[in-house]
Amino acid sequence: MIALLSINFVAFFVFLLILKYWINFQRNKGIGKYIRKEGPSSHFQKSGTPVMGGIVFILAVFPFLFFKETFFISLSTILFGLLGLVDDLKLMENKDYGIRPLRKIFLSFIITLILYVFSPHDYKIYWGSHLIIDSSILYIFLFFIILIAVPNAINLTDGLDGLAGGTSLVTLIFLLVYSFHFKKIALEISLMITALLAFLWFNSHPAEIFMGDVGAFALGGFIASLSVVNKVELLLIFLSGIFLIESLSVFIQVFFYKWKKKRIFLMSPIHHHFELKGWKETKIVWRFYIIHLLIIIGGLVLWYWS
């Protein structure tokens, strides 16, 4: 335990130094976030904020690529993180668009196909201690849904200072407790949490750096693969809390607009709706933290009481 705490203590300051250097480097080079005109007007002041702070999430898992127990989790994090990095770089090159949504989903599918080869191939799906499904076809379908959906969901959540990072932190703390009997996996999660804390040091409102797609996709790949390894694929519905709500708000908005030519929300994802309703950014973030935590606790109660 002392060794674990020592490693994370040192890692925290290493990540802080890396992020501080990365922020200063981008400022000196004039690199920063481009805010699109159709976004909330309150975000225009964020223009020019350094990006791609999520690179530290890839650094946190890279050493674990060389261990059998953590290879799949690390590979998932790195591959999805690299997809996000390419998207960030394209956004810097062409400020209006990065990788097109359909192409991004297709690339996510290719990555998931690669990851399936290295996955545990345990086709059983549990709810608590109860075996719900034992079917390779259904499991493969669920595997692809999870690995594609979670990174994209966290990417949609990453729209306010500290929102995606803070909610991911809550999810990972619960996954750390659940994984504590797997020493290498627990160490990897603890280092990711440490990287997140270092990132949030600079991402708290007003943010000095954004995680970028590289961070959102890396976190998504990490959380999704952890749920597969820990056999909590169904519990992930609750562990995803706010990520799921944000994604559903986009789906509902698009579907209803195509159907009725009307919008349910002032803007989606739903955190922008509350911004346009006049809520302060910090109030939205903290209330979303609370909702996310309550959903996870509710899911855990159902999981263990089953």
Curated annotation (Swiss-Prot):
EC main group: transferase
Catalytic activity, reaction form: UDP-N-acetyl-alpha-D-muramoyl-L-alanyl-gamma-D-glutamyl-meso-2,6-diaminopimeloyl-D-alanyl-D-alanine + di-trans,octa-cis-undecaprenyl phosphate = di-trans,octa-cis-undecaprenyl diphospho-N-acetyl-alpha-D-muramoyl-L-alanyl-D-glutamyl-meso-2,6-diaminopimeloyl-D-alanyl-D-alanine + UMP
Listed pathway(s): Cell wall biogenesis; peptidoglycan biosynthesis
Gene Ontology BP, a term: cell wall organization
Pfam family name, one: Glycos_transf_4
Key words, A-Z: Cell cycle, Cell division, Cell inner membrane, Cell membrane, Cell shape, Cell wall biogenesis/degradation, Magnesium, Membrane, Metal-binding, Peptidoglycan synthesis, Transferase, Transmembrane, Transmembrane helix
Ranges in coiled-coil conformation: none
Transmembrane segments: 2-22, 47-67, 71-91, 105-125, 131-151, 162-182, 185-205, 209-229, 236-256, 284-304
Principal localisation: membrane
Membrane topology, as annotated: Multi-pass membrane protein
Localisation per UniProt entry: Cell inner membrane
InterPro entries recorded: Glycosyl_transferase_4, PNAcMuramoyl-5peptid_Trfase, PNAcMuramoyl-5peptid_Trfase_CS
One CC-aspect GO term: plasma membrane
HAMAP family: MraY
Similarity section: Belongs to the glycosyltransferase 4 family. MraY subfamily.
Function according to Swiss-Prot or TrEMBL: Catalyzes the initial step of the lipid cycle reactions in the biosynthesis of the cell wall peptidoglycan: transfers peptidoglycan precursor phospho-MurNAc-pentapeptide from UDP-MurNAc-pentapeptide onto the lipid carrier undecaprenyl phosphate, yielding undecaprenyl-pyrophosphoryl-MurNAc-pentapeptide, known as lipid I.
The protein's name: Phospho-N-acetylmuramoyl-pentapeptide-transferase
